[in-house]
Structure formats: structure tokens, C-alpha cells
């Protein structure tokens, strides 16, 4: 679950980290009033969406008058911002962040993720702030400096100083950087985050460090113990189908194709999409129904897949390990009958009671195509889409 920039900065403030004074506004009038609270300009106005690349898309602007603030808010509030990180529809702009402009002398980067290879939280710092860190990692990886947090000791001040020295910081900037490093690490661990990022972390012309931007991603599996983060969730920024799937403990990611995929297991789901692509098809989604593929969850999965108007056929690929294929077949039959599926449905069952499951599908009288294997399933669903 991602947070908006203004929400990230609210958390920064709670932990004593420096950030520009700013206010999130939902109307042009609020935006003008926010400028008055901040004081004399210039100000920076930013569209609040869960996506990067806002500046290049016109969603961030430095303004010198309250009239310009009102015009920016009137132009963007209620609209959708399209960036290189969004789809063609973009993300809805429901809030504008108005904050004091900062005199920037230099831009840095500081962020942290959970590194699965080392099984630790790893902090990354770079002198190349203000640009996508992925681009820096690809083109100039030697400019990214890393430290890993020991799970027993947690973050240590010497690690912050080590990064500061590698960034070429001196004097009071080393102390300020270390404080920010320790604060970010504390936020990361106490708030069960999966990602935290300040890009850019700037050195002002006055010689101080300030968190000019903030990006936080919470671990969805830990939200049950982070009630204040749950309250910050903005479902308008999420795919409504993904949000509906999450309510049923289904993992759904929308794609651009026309073949709906329903699979149990993330690895099998990715393999299914690969083989569909291999045989000339285009997956419309990733959908993992998990180990407990009950009739109710299968029914809901069909509803979610078919809510995408692009879907011309559905491929159901189930391996019966934890669950029995005959019970899955009952769920598929009941779901197809209840939902009223009007597109071809190809089903491949393997594993526990697969033969009995295939027989139930064949005897159902419904328009369900039973596949003999994964390759056959991919070929049949692609042929069904092409009308062959």
C-alpha cells in the first residue's frame, strides 16, 4: 500500500525529520489559504498521485502568486494525471500539496527496501538525486552506496556517517544526514514498510538538509497492526478490480491483453502468462486464487476478470496439491452458471483428483473447454480468441 507525498511528510514530521512547510488541499480556495499560512512566496504546488514523473507531466510547478496557485488547482483537481508510471488513463488528482519553495544547492538520494537476497533492510544513498534511481542503478551503479541493517542491533549512527562520507558531506551536514538516516530507519522498522524513499534529499543554499519529497510503501501483510496507516489508504489511486480482489484474498494485477487468467499459485500464474504469450496470446491479467480456491472465491475471480471489457476468453489453470481438482471443478461449474460467462472458458486441471474434475466439467453441459495439458490449454484459449 502506497502513501501520498503529503502523508509521507506528515510521518517525517512525527519523527523529527526536516521537510518543507506544506498543506494538502482539496479545493482552489484551500490552496490559496494554504499559501497565506505558509507566508511569502514563491511556493511549490504538487499534484498528489501514487506515481512518479509528476514534474515532467506538468503536475509540479513553482509559482509566485496566489492567482497562479488557484489556476493550478482549478486546472488539476478532479482531473487525471498521466505519467510514465501510470497507464493511459492516469491517476485521479484529489489533493494538491502547497508548500514553501526551497532554495536548492544540491540534490541527493536516500532510500531503503527489503533486500531478499541478504534478508535485511538495505539503505541506498547517491549523489544523483532528483532522477529515477532505477536509471542510476542501470547506467552508473558505482554511484549508489549501500548499507544493510543488522536485525539484532538495528540502525547504527556509524552507518549513517559512513554513507554521509561517501556522499562527500562534511561538518554539520554529516550530523544532519545521520539524524535523517536514523529517523528513516526507525520509521521503516516501526511502521512495517516495504519501501521508503527521499528523492531528492536536498542541500539548501543555507547549508541544511531537507526532505523535499517522500515516498512510502507499506507492507500489506502487516497493515493489521498499523491502524493509522490503514486510515491513510487512498483507494481512488488503486485499480478497483485489484481492491475488490484483495477483499477476497485474491492477488490481481491488470494487464493490457484479452485473455483472462485464473491460476492457483503465483509461480504457476506467471508461467501461464508466459506460455499464453509464447503461443501468440496476450494475458489480460495476473490472478492468483491461492490454495483455498473455494466456489465463492472462484466465482468472485470470474466476476473480476469479466469486469474487464477487453477479455475475450478465460484460461483457468489449476494444480491440485492443497485442493482437490474435483472440488475446483464444482466451483468452476457453479461460478460459470452463476456469473453467466459469455466468453469461451478453457480449463486445465492437474494433480489431486484431476480425472474426476475433468469428468465433472465434461458432464456439466456448460461451454467449458477441457484442456489436456498446459500447452494444449494455451493453444486452445488463443484459438478461441481468434475465433478458430
Curated annotation (Swiss-Prot):
Pathway: Carbohydrate metabolism; tricarboxylic acid cycle; succinate from succinyl-CoA (ligase route): step 1/1. Mg(2+) binds at residues 199, 213. It is an enzyme of class 6 (ligase). Signal peptide: none annotated. The keyword Ribosomal protein does not apply. Substrate binds at residues 264, 321-323. Residues 9-244 form the ATP-grasp domain. GO terms for biological process: succinyl-CoA metabolic process; tricarboxylic acid cycle. One of its GO terms (cellular component) is succinate-CoA ligase complex. InterPro entries: ATP-grasp (IPR011761), ATP-grasp_succ-CoA_synth-type (IPR013650), ATP_grasp_subdomain_1 (IPR013815), Succ-CoA_synthase_bsu_CS (IPR017866), SUCC_ACL_C (IPR005811), Succ_CoA_ligase-like_bsu (IPR005809), Succinyl-CoA_synth-like (IPR016102). NCBIfam families: PRK00696.1 (NF001913), sucCoAbeta (TIGR01016). Heterotetramer of two alpha and two beta subunits. This is Succinate--CoA ligase [ADP-forming] subunit beta. It comes from Shigella flexneri serotype 5b (strain 8401). The lineage of its organism: Bacteria, Pseudomonadati, Pseudomonadota, Gammaproteobacteria, Enterobacterales. The gene is sucC.
Amino acid at each position: 500500500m502506497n502513501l501520498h507525498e503529503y502523508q509521507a511528510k506528515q510521518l517525517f514530521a512525527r519523527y523529527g525529520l526536516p521537510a518543507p512547510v506544506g498543506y494538502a488541499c482539496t479545493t482552489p480556495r484551500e490552496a490559496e489559504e494554504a499559501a497565506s499560512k505558509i507566508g511569502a512566496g514563491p511556493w511549490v504546488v504538487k499534484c498528489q498521485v501514487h506515481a512518479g514523473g509528476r514534474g515532467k507531466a506538468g503536475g509540479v510547478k513553482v509559482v509566485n502568486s496566489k492567482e497562479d496557485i488557484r489556476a493550478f488547482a482549478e486546472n488539476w483537481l478532479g482531473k487525471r494525471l498521466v505519467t510514465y508510471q501510470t497507464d493511459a488513463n492516469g491517476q485521479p488528482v484529489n489533493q494538491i500539496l502547497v508548500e514553501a519553495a526551497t532554495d536548492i544547492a544540491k540534490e541527493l538520494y536516500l532510500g531503503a527496501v527489503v533486500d531478499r537476497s541478504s534478508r535485511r533492510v538495505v539503505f541506498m544513498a547517491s549523489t544523483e538525486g532528483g532522477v529515477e534511481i532505477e536509471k542510476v542503478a542501470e547506467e552508473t551503479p558505482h554511484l549508489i552506496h549501500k548499507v544493510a541493517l543488522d536485525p539484532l542491533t538495528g540502525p547504527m549512527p556509524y552507518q549513517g556517517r559512513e554513507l554521509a562520507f561517501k556522499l562527500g558531506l562534511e561538518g554539520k551536514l554529516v550530523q544532519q544526514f545521520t539524524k535523517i538516516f536514523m529517523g528513516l530507519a526507525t520509521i521503516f522498522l516501526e511502521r512495517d514498510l516495504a519501501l521508503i524513499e527521499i528523492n531528492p534529499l536536498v542541500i539548501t543554499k543555507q547549508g541544511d538538509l531537507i526532505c523535499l519529497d517522500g515516498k512510502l510503501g507499506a507492507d500489506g501483510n502487516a497493515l493489521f497492526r498499523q491502524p493509522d496507516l490503514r486510515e491513510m489508504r487512498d483507494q481512488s489511486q488503486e485499480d478497483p478490480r485489484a481492491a475488490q480482489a484483495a477483499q477476497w484474498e485474491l492477488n490481481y494485477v491488470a494487464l493490457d491483453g484479452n485473455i483472462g487468467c485464473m491460476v492457483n499459485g503465483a509461480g504457476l500464474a506467471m508461467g501461464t502468462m508466459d506460455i499464453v504469450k509464447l503461443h501468440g496470446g496476450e494475458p489480460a491479467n495476473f490472478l492468483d486464487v491461492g490454495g483455498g480456491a473455494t466456489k465463492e472465491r472462484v466465482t468472485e475471480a470470474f466476476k473480476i476478470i469479466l469486469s474487464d471489457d477487453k477479455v475475450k476468453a478465460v484460461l483457468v489453470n489449476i494444480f491440485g496439491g492443497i485442493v482437490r481438482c474435483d472440488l475446483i471443478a464444482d466451483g468452476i461449474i457453479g461460478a460459470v452458471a452463476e456469473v453467466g460467462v459469455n466468453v469461451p472458458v478453457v480449463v486445465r486441471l492437474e494433480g489431486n483428483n484431476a480425472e474426476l474434475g475433468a469428468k465433472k466439467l465434461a458432464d456439466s453441459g456448460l461451454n467449458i473447454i477441457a484442456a489436456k495439458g498446459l500447452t494444449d490449454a494455451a493453444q486452445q484459449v488463443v484459438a478461441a480468441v481468434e475465433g478458430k
